[in-house]
Amino acid sequence: MSAPKKVVLAYSGGLDTSIILKWLQTEYGCEVVTFTADLGQGEELEPARAKAEMMGASDIYIEDVREEFVRDFVFPMFRANAVYEGLYLLGTSIARPLISKRLVEIAEETGADAIAHGATGKGNDQVRFELAAYALNPDIKVIAPWREWDLSSRTKLIDFAEKNQIPIAKDKRGEAPFSVDANLLHTSSEGKVLENPAVDAPDYVYQRTVNPEDAPDTPEYIEIGFEKGDAVSINGEAMSPATILTKLNEIGGKHGCGRLDLVEGRFVGMKSRGIYETPGGTLLLEAHRGIESITLDRGAMHLKDELMPRYAELIYNGFWFSPERTMLQAAIDASQTHVTGTVRLKLYKGLARTVGRWSDHSLYSEAHVTFEEDAGAYDQTDAAGFIQLNALRLKLLAARDRRLKS
């Protein structure tokens, strides 16, 4: 690749991307345009602007994309009840395609030769950023400094920062922070003591949730309203997608909901350990499953359950803009036509449990399932023929096996 003259950098204002900004200027002698997305990470973003200006960025983009993030990425994913490897709610994975989309758009707007990101050569994010970028612009050039430079450790990064007078953030204990990714859906923490999966994570790692043991001693009940699979209200109050997730984070975090300590299988082949906090997403997933339980037909629900692991894997691996994800999304969205109603959750010391659900689109018939008189709603003698028909092949198999044994 010929040396670029202008690069659009996904910039957080943190240590890694600040070093990358300086490295791009030094290595390529190019202009650097920074893009910082407000995904609801809870940080003041003006310091990122000031830092980029101080370091000589030629242009600075800081954009509030919270509503787009939740409406066009998080909510479609939650319609699928997507969970990777049984635990991970894909908080980091789902943010990457939106960031890549804006990187490509800004590159085209500014006439940049390339885009750059701060993902390491060991992780999934390099794959996610680049697959999304190439899906949107097959001719885009991507610079991944972690795969090029010799700054192969945190120690070398810090040395580079000190030599180039780049400020180094400290955590509240005065130490270099964990590797943290945050957005409106979740916060993840990796590295340092967490790299040993046998060691219990210290409580100071958690940023968004209280320790469940310290959560309120009184349960809280909330009601989440849905229309066609998407949350539209909390306790009867209509809200925008980002506002709903923000409010659910606040409520769930207060009760210690959504903490995960997990080891996941990365797309690049290795396993990694992380501490994930997804308070609002945990409540949203529980409630969405609750409303689906009374509005989705059994066949549709079971098919969704079969498709979900593949859908989740596509998002995890970076294939959001792939045709197969789009095809699955169309099927999932079609299933949500009648997923409308309200779910009541009980929140208590780290647990979020569905305790009520109702809908004008409900398939639940109390008349059919009652243990009392059903006024002829269901003829129990019909079950005999149903059982005999379903047993026929099993009887034939058993008869053959007995015959062969004798």
Swiss-Prot record:
PROSITE patterns found in the cross-reference section: ARGININOSUCCIN_SYN_1, ARGININOSUCCIN_SYN_2
Main location class: cytoplasm
Disulfide bonds: none
Keywords of the record: Amino-acid biosynthesis, Arginine biosynthesis, ATP-binding, Cytoplasm, Ligase, Nucleotide-binding
Chain segments annotated as coiled-coil in the UniProt record: none
Pfam families in the record: Arginosuc_syn_C (PF20979), Arginosuc_synth (PF00764)
Binding of L-citrulline, residues: Y88, S93, N124, R128, S179, S188, E264, Y276
GO biological process: argininosuccinate metabolic process; L-arginine biosynthetic process; urea cycle
Entry annotated with the keyword Nucleotide-binding: yes
Residues reported in the UniProt entry to bind ATP: A10, Y11, S12, G13, G14, L15, D16, T17, S18, A37, G118
InterPro entries membership: Arginosuc_syn_C, Arginosuc_syn_N, Arginosuc_synth, Arginosuc_synth_CS, Arginosuc_synth_type_1_subfam, AS_cat/multimer_dom_body, Rossmann-like_a/b/a_fold
Keyword Membrane found: no
Subcellular location: Cytoplasm
Gene Ontology MF: a single term: ATP binding
Residue numbers binding L-aspartate: T120, N124, D125
Involved pathway(s): Amino-acid biosynthesis; L-arginine biosynthesis; L-arginine from L-ornithine and carbamoyl phosphate: step 2/3
Catalyses which reaction(s): L-citrulline + L-aspartate + ATP = 2-(N(omega)-L-arginino)succinate + AMP + diphosphate + H(+)
Enzyme nomenclature, EC number: 6.3.4.5
Highest taxon above the source species: Bacteria
GO cellular component: cytoplasm
Self-association and partners: Homotetramer.
NCBIfam families: argG, PRK00509.1
PANTHER family, per database record: ARGININOSUCCINATE SYNTHASE
Entry's family note: Belongs to the argininosuccinate synthase family. Type 1 subfamily.
Protein name: Argininosuccinate synthase
Lineage of the species this protein comes from: Bacteria, Pseudomonadati, Pseudomonadota, Alphaproteobacteria, Rhodobacterales
